[in-house]
A protein has these predicted regions:
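ABC-family P-loop ATPase nucleotide-binding domain
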Residues: 1-16, 223-226
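H-loop (His-switch) and adjacent beta-strand-loop-beta switch element
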Residues: 214-226
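ABC family nucleotide-binding domain
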Residues: 7-8, 14-217
Length: 226
């Protein structure tokens, strides 16, 4: 049996865009992969391209050249509809803004992606809500929840379908320091329970300390910082 495929793999990718008369390089012949059982913090200065790199891994942005694979599947070969279906099944996405549906309860918001993917499992949903400390909030709507509670619901939504890969872009950017530390700790624990590899974009060294490795993006290159 051959070696197990990396959860995601960027192979010699290039990505740039023009800002007035200047060419901004997000990636220059950049390669990066992460195996199952590992997670990573992605750091860098503002404008370095961290969010763009995450969008490339998620298939939300294209590369100028190179290959992007998730679970061994090349995203560059998929049609738009195939990519949407693949993303729904294989990825969990968490953003600084929670994007919860106001008319749905916390439970139905969290179950949304798993139900769309046809893999909703009530027992795992119960486990996630207990792990994240929101089991008593299941019937409340987003407007009745604090920012930290809403982010925990968003985390449950991203993990409930047990995706191969979870990408979190500044997931605690709107939370205070104490709440942020608690939410990141719960995110790492819940991702492990779901069997998901986790990548977190952050400016915070404290948050990066919760992850097993830290990478820094600068001038189109990645440096393994810790």
């Amino acid at each position: 049996m051959g070696p197990k495929a990396a959860v995601f793999e960027l192979s010699h990718i290039d990505k740039s865009f023009r800002d007035r008369d200047e060419v901004i390089h997000i990636a220059r012949d950049l390669s990066w992969s992460l195996d199952a059982g590992h997670n990573a913090a992605l750091m860098g200065e503002s404008g370095a391209g961290k969010t763009t790199l995450m969008n490339i891994i998620a298939g939300l942005d294209h590369v100028d050249s190179g290959d992007v694979r998730v679970g061994g599947q090349s995203l560059t070969t998929l049609s738009s509809s195939e990519l949407t279906d693949f993303r729904r099944r294989a990825l969990g996405l968490i953003f600084q803004k929670f994007h919860l549906v106001p008319s749905l309860s916390a439970w139905d918001n969290a179950a949304l992606q798993a139900r769309l993917a046809g893999v909703f499992a009530a027992d795992f949903a119960e486990h996630l809500f207990e792990t994240l400390g929101i089991e008593h909030l299941r019937h409340r709507h987003p407007g009745q929840l604090s920012g930290g509670q809403q982010q925990r619901v968003a985390i449950a939504r991203a993990l409930m379908h047990r995706p191969q890969l979870v990408l979190a872009d500044e997931p605690t950017g709107n939370l205070d320091e104490a709440t942020s530390d608690k939410v990141i700790s719960l995110l790492v624990e819940a991702a492990s329970d779901a069997g998901s590899t986790l990548v977190v974009v952050t400016h915070s060294a404290a948050i990066a300390g919760h992850l097993t490795s830290t990478w820094r993006l600068a001038s189109g290159s990645l440096i393994h910082a810790a």
